[in-house]
């Protein structure tokens, strides 16, 4: 099967972030990285549950914390938890595209749906200067991040536009070109950072992410060297022979 077909079989579409709940550890890492604190008004878009709001209020003492999600069951359950624990967070059930986030100082935004991202981009561009938007894995489309602690990325208003996809990619990885070691390092950071109970084989997912990172870099012309590294070739063969997961066609597309 093609790699895209395999990704669709993963629990909660794990690799893309769709409907995945961040761990408490991840929230704390993100909040420390973005320097969340008492003056801040924090929004978690697509919150899914109350956990990020609870930690923002109880541990980081934010001025205000709001979670928004369009799943009524999840929002209702999250509200009940906050009420039971007497935590003054706000939880709103609506589509984030329709939400008023104009007072935000820090926003957590982890979506992969292009239509949602593109609609929100216009909304973000109208936010007040210095507002921080945290994304995971990559920055906002066509933008250069303000700060990176991979896989966590801070985008700051006003957004800085990238001159090219290559410039954007290199701003994330901090290297002039992406080799196997770089791809593996960042894939491992991602897998460990978003670790959930569904991840039973970190190494397996790290291999998949490594191949995705390197092949994307190759397509963008920022992979180190012209030849495919031996390690990449080995893992591509391993995926095909042992798991019937095909990456080779992606390289063929690149060479056309």
Give a label for each model feature:
Residues 71:
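Conserved SAM/SAH-binding beta-strand->alpha-helix loop
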Residues 156-206:
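Charged, amphipathic alpha-helical linkers/stalks
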Residues 78-79:
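Conserved SAM-binding loop
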Residues 85-96:
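Conserved SAM-binding strand-loop segment of SAM-dependent methyltransferases
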Residues 1-37:
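S-adenosyl-L-methionine
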């Amino acid at each position: 099967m093609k790699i895209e077909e395999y990704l669709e079989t993963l629990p909660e579409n794990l690799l893309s972030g769709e409907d995945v709940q961040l761990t408490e550890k991840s929230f704390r890492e993100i909040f420390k990285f973005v320097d969340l604190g008492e003056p801040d008004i924090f929004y978690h878009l697509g919150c899914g549950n109350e956990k990020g709001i609870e930690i923002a209020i109880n541990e980081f003492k934010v001025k205000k914390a709001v979670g928004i999600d369009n799943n009524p069951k999840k929002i209702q359950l999250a509200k009940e938890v906050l009420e039971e624990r007497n935590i003054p967070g706000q939880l709103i059930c609506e589509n984030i595209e329709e939400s008023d986030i104009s007072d935000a100082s820090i926003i957590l935004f982890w979506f992969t749906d292009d239509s949602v991202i593109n609609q929100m981009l216009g909304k973000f561009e109208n936010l007040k200067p210095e507002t921080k938007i945290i994304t995971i894995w990559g920055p906002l489309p066509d933008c250069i991040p303000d700060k990176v602690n991979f896989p966590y990325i801070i985008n700051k208003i006003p957004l800085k536009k990238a001159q090219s996809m290559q410039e954007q990619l290199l701003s994330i990885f901090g290297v002039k070109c992406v080799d196997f070691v770089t791809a593996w390092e960042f894939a491992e950071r991602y897998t460990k950072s978003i670790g959930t109970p569904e991840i039973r084989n970190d190494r397996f997912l790290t291999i998949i992410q490594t191949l995705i990172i390197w092949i994307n870099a190759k397509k963008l012309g920022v992979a180190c060297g012209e030849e495919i590294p031996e390690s990449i070739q080995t893992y591509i063969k391993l995926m095909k022979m042992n798991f019937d997961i095909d990456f080779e066609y992606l390289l063929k597309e690149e060479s056309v």
